[in-house]
Amino acid sequence: MPDQKIDNLLNLAMDATPQERRKSGNLNIGYDPATRLWDVIIKYSGPESGLAGNGIQVVPLLGGYAVVTLPESEIDEYSHRAQVEFMEKPKRLYFELFQAKGASCIRTVQTGRNGLTGKGILTGVVDSGVDYFHPDFRNADGSSRILRLWDQSIQGNPPQGYVTGTEYTKEQIDEALALGENQGRRLVPSSDYSGHGTSVLGIAAGNGRASDGVNQGVAYESDLLVVKMGIPRENSFPRTTELIQGIDYLVRQALTMGRPMAINLSFGNNYGSHKGDSLLETYIDMVSSIGRLAICTGTGNNGNQPLHEGGTLKQGQTRQIELSVSSREPTLNVQLWKSYEDEMSIYIENPSGNRIGPLDEKLGPQRYRLGNTDLLIYYGKPGPYHLTQEIYIDFLPGKTYVDSGDWKIILSGKKVRGGEYYLWLPGGNTLNRGTGFYE
């Protein structure tokens, strides 16, 4: 029976077949098939001493959170430990770069009466890395403004308290800079292959040396702390388990140095209720109250894409949500979020007009076949970190691709009090052009 101390996606992943997990774009995130180990985020209470052992590795974080690596066979038993309050599956992260310095009126803040430049504070980023040779991240004497760089993708010498990656100090980075690019990058081999992290840090804190002061960032006189997310794997996009450890590292560094810090997060995803109740979101809320800390997030790149639908359903009313699926779509999923107290009948219709429903409101996975598409559906039930109910629908190809055309999700109000509902598709440009909800 599904465990209500485990989030919906992890429950579904445990119940899905290996073939279903391979076809899904979500269910295997956090799982290493080579070692058969899962990375998960947990919230716990009490001492951390009893969390590890017997092939279970734990990275304790601030505030009673931790990242745990454990065998798949141990997940259910581990969740039943008294000190484990909740367990959450990692989610894949995507770029959410924002470029709004002018629109934010930052220049007037920098040049006004107070002349705020970031001097004396720390700017931290958790992203795809940084080009530490870039002039905008170097002082006038050529030395680095970066005090610490934790590259999670290079194994060797992780920071104290963590188990992955390599930490580089300002002294090591300065030595690499003095050697020049060819020799220096051998000493400190951390790179930013996508350029996303370098752009983000430039907007947040670049000093403008590369452009003679024209393209200065917001806090251009601040000192810098950088975390490059990522563990080498087939799919290079990072996960929430890496993000939460990066935030934890930055906060601990700021506390050790006794300095205020602003953290920029320009990675994200569309998964969740968008009410701030995931473990990652509650962790960010918690650490935001520690010390002198501000956490800033990007607004995303999906504002003009048809990835969200919502409305209010009245009792006895029927709503039809139309979803266009373009050709050659290998997989997709839909999250439907609503209040637990609202009872709705849910039907799904494929482009050929064949329909299933009403879906059973029961714990555990439900499986249906419509045309050449398999539907894997999970009804979420109340849990300690679930403020709203999730109905998760995975569209899996019977052969190679999900059936293209116009799908319909039909909602019928049975016993309705509030009636609000929201549907989300994955973001991060993971879907083909033409896939999305109709306006």
Language model feature labels by segment:
Residues 231-313, 329-345, 349-355, 364-366, ...:
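Substrate-binding/access-modulating region of protease and related hydrolase catalytic domains
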Residues 142, 147-184, 255, 318-327, ...:
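Flexible, acidic/histidine-containing loops and adjacent segments that form or flank the divalent-metal
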